[in-house]
């Protein structure tokens, strides 16, 4: 009679080979780089839009000369990191603490500017409309004026937000939008946003 004892090892010896092959395949899948993930990040350049002022740091007090108690000059502003594809910039300056930061009831708008060239890089202190970069437009603040209106809080210390938007479109020339109208116009066109906040409390 032919013995079958020797056949068992030959059959079971194939199992480890199959398992090793399967594990090798799974291991290869686990460590293989994702082509999709690589293609999404390859060549990507992260650029952060930044807005600064030499007059005050973010969160610090705004100097008196930029307020109604001083010379009412707009502070010097500088920006960098506008993303590729930015056609222009829009700037809104407002105070969400009006009239009393303890019980705010409205946001008071101090300055509205649009179609700023991204390449301009800065605005000088106290810049007049005629000295703005070519093609720049201005809107209406809550005094119904087109020029900068400095902090003039009736009660307490208020926060003043300088908000800069990088846009993928140019807005109509010769337009004098309110803040609300400008915000509506830029919806869906904002590539990046930067913010600078300063505070002010009247000295008397």
Language-model segments: residues:
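N-terminus-centered regions that define maturation/targeting leaders and the start
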Residues: 33-204
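The N-terminal extracellular segments of secreted preproproteins, especially immediately downstream
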Residues: 9, 17-19, 67, 151
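Bacterial N-terminal signal peptides
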Residues: 16-30
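N-terminal secretory signal peptides that target proteins for export/translocation
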Residues: 1-13
């Amino acid at each position: 009679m032919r013995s079958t004892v020797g056949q068992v090892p030959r059959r079971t010896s194939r199992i480890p080979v199959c398992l090793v092959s399967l594990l090798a395949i799974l291991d290869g899948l686990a460590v293989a780089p994702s082509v999709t993930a690589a293609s999404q990040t390859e060549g990507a350049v992260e650029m952060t839009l930044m807005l600064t002022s030499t007059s005050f740091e973010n969160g610090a007090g705004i100097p008196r000369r930029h307020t109604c108690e001083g010379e009412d000059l707009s502070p010097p502003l500088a920006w960098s990191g506008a993303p590729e594809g930015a056609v222009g910039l829009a700037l809104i300056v407002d105070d969400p603490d009006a009239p009393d930061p303890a019980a705010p009831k409205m946001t008071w708008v101090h300055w509205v500017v649009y179609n700023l060239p991204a390449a301009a890089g800065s605005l000088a202190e106290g810049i007049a409309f005629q000295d703005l970069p070519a093609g720049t437009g201005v809107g209406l603040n809550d005094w119904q004026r087109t020029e900068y209106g400095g902090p003039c809080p009736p009660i307490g210390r208020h926060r003043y937000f300088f908000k800069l938007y990088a846009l993928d479109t140019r807005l109509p020339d010769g337009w004098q939008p309110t803040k609300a109208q400008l915000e509506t116009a830029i919806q869906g066109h904002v590539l990046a946003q930067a913010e600078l906040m300063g505070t002010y409390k009247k000295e008397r």
